Amino acid sequence: MSASSRSQVLSLYKIMLRESQRFSSYNYRTYAIRRIRDAFREKKNVDDFLEIETLLHRAKENLNVIQRQVTIGQMYATHKLVIESAEHR
């Protein structure tokens, strides 16, 4: 993987994790973070440039989905779960 591809992938990974932290729902937040980490780990050894480009494109689409869902979740917020209240102590 070239240096520019590597920096693009790492940047996108960090942005996706940061955006996932914005989910108001504990379950959505933990699921999204776990899926992002697992997906990036699974594909970390890909060397084919075209496949990397395809994966980057798919990840950018998923980032858009995450951002949209975070916005929708904030519009229709629900009560916090008991486990979320304990996290802030």
UniProtKB/Swiss-Prot annotation:
* Role: Required for nuclear and mitochondrial iron-sulfur protein biosynthesis.
Q: What is its main location?
A: mitochondrion
Q: Tell me the InterPro entries matching this sequence.
A: Complex1_LYR_dom, Complex1_LYR_LYRM4, ISC_assembly_LYR
Q: In which pathway does it act?
A: Cofactor biosynthesis; iron-sulfur cluster biosynthesis
Homology family: Belongs to the complex I LYR family.
Biological process terms in GO annotation: iron-sulfur cluster assembly
Classification via CDD domains: Complex1_LYR_LYRM4
Q: Which GO terms describe its cellular component?
A: L-cysteine desulfurase complex; mitochondrion; nucleus
Question: Which superkingdom heads the taxonomic lineage of this protein's source?
Answer: Eukaryota
Q: Which keywords describe this protein according to UniProt? A: Mitochondrion, Nucleus
Q: What is this protein called?
A: LYR motif-containing protein 4
Q: Where in the cell is it found?
A: Mitochondrion; Nucleus
Question: Source species, please?
Answer: Xenopus laevis
